[in-house]
C-alpha cells in the first residue's frame, strides 16, 4: 500500500471493512463508520496492464469512454503475474471485474482491466506447510 489509504478514505472503500468491528455499543467514530459502510460511492480497485512498460507512478487520469472517472493512487510492476499493476478509487458503478479503463501515460492512453484480488495465487494453491 502506498497512497491508497489516508484521511480522505475509509476502510470500506479500501476493502478493509473486515477489520472494523461495529459490535461495541459505543465508541468514538462509530456513527461515522456506519455511515461510511452504508454510503459507499467509490471503491479501491486493482488495474492491470499487459504491457509491463505502462507502470503508473500515481495521479495519472483514468477514463471510461470520454469521462475521467478517477486517478491512479499507486502502481508498480507485477513481476510474478508479468503485468503492470495500478490501484485507484473509482465510482462504484465502474468497479466491476473485467471493466476496461484507459489510463494516460505521458500523453498516451493505454488500456487496462480491473481485476479481482488477490492478483497472485487467488486460490491459495501455492501455500505450502
Show where each model-derived region lies:
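Conserved, structured C-terminal
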Residues: 1-129
Amino acid at each position: 500500500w502506498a497512497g491508497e489509504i489516508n484521511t480522505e478514505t475509509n476502510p470500506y472503500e479500501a476493502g478493509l471493512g473486515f477489520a472494523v468491528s461495529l459490535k461495541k455499543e459505543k465508541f468514538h467514530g462509530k456513527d461515522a463508520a456506519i455511515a461510511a459502510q452504508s454510503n459507499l460511492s467509490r471503491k479501491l480497485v486493482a488495474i492491470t496492464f499487459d504491457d509491463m512498460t505502462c507502470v503508473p507512478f500515481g495521479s495519472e487520469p483514468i477514463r471510461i469512454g470520454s469521462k475521467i472517472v478517477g486517478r491512479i493512487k499507486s502502481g508498480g510492476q507485477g513481476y510474478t503475474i508479468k503485468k503492470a499493476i495500478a490501484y485507484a478509487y473509482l465510482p462504484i458503478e465502474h468497479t466491476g471485474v473485467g471493466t476496461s479503463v484507459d489510463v494516460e501515460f505521458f500523453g498516451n492512453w493505454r488500456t487496462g482491466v480491473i481485476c479481482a484480488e488477490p492478483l497472485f495465487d487467488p486460490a491459495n494453491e501455492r501455500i505450502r506447510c
